[in-house]
């Protein structure tokens, strides 16, 4: 008997779901949200039970990887229990989480016990003052303590996510890489996404391509092409000097990954986003609440939604905003 498969109209298999569990965050990163962000009222967001119901239907339809995001997922009460329930779904191979690391000093061990398989931790600077400037509120030492707690809890292939911005942190690329090597962490360098209207910097001036990052790395290390994949947008390389870790590049501008896109996103409001860089979406919250106890209705809505998944985004790295919603509203 063949496994169920979600397929879009371009014959791309969709088996990876990113689920935002909150739009709230204890940081205010300059590329992610406005400093005076207004968050959604509680009645407007999905309950944990509703999030679980969506996860159940996606896994039944062939999803093999789920990533929980935010906002900062670990500020949502009850998220560890949600992880335990999602991790237990038959057929799911990976339950991952993207976090800023601020809560990991106390939650890394419970997350590992709950069945979370991998963590991505955002880290854009190793300079405490610059880290505070980029996050507006973050404490670098607390995040590093969280990274160490993740290693101590038993997580492997923990990955650092670094958004590289010209003139802000591009000079730290190799220092971040050395930090990753020292702690046996993977790392992905990310081109800034043009989501939301920001005021801290000009995206046209701060754009730093993946090719430029590789050139900077080559000043200190030897990059070796790799066929590694985590079923996400990162294209991986290895280092001759540290072959045990993976170096990823997420390049929505310079080398977009649309042709092999295998993922969709669920916002905390219950909108199923079919593309990070477009507004094509389906309101799954409305389906859930109009049809309690009828999972087949939700399943049909998910299957039908695949037919409006676009071929690609239209990101550019000028100061034009392609998508008005901020990253924390999208699911980072």
Curated annotation (Swiss-Prot):
Enzymatic class: lyase
Disulphide-bridged cysteine pairs: none
This protein's pathway: Cofactor biosynthesis; molybdopterin biosynthesis
Cofactor(s) the protein requires to work: [4Fe-4S] cluster
Domain (Radical SAM core) ranges: 9-220
GO biological process: Mo-molybdopterin cofactor biosynthetic process
Binding positions (S-adenosyl-L-methionine): 31, 71, 122, 193
Catalytically driven reaction(s): GTP + AH2 + S-adenosyl-L-methionine = (8S)-3',8-cyclo-7,8-dihydroguanosine 5'-triphosphate + 5'-deoxyadenosine + L-methionine + A + H(+)
Gene Ontology MF terms: 4 iron, 4 sulfur cluster binding; cyclic pyranopterin monophosphate synthase activity; GTP 3',8'-cyclase activity; GTP binding; metal ion binding; S-adenosyl-L-methionine binding
SMART domains: Elp3
InterPro entries: Aldolase_TIM, Elp3/MiaA/NifB-like_rSAM, MoaA, MoaA_NifB_PqqE_Fe-S-bd_CS, MoaA_twitch, MoCo_biosynth_MoaA/MoaC, rSAM
Binding site for GTP: 18, 67, 98, 159, 263-265
Signal sequence range: none
Amino-acid positions noted as binding [4Fe-4S] cluster 2 in the UniProt annotation, renumbered to this chain: 258, 261, 275
UniProt entry keywords in alphabetical sequence: 4Fe-4S, GTP-binding, Iron, Iron-sulfur, Lyase, Metal-binding, Molybdenum cofactor biosynthesis, Nucleotide-binding, S-adenosyl-L-methionine
UniProt subunit comment: Monomer and homodimer.
Protein name: GTP 3',8-cyclase
Lineage: Bacteria, Pseudomonadati, Pseudomonadota, Gammaproteobacteria, Pseudomonadales
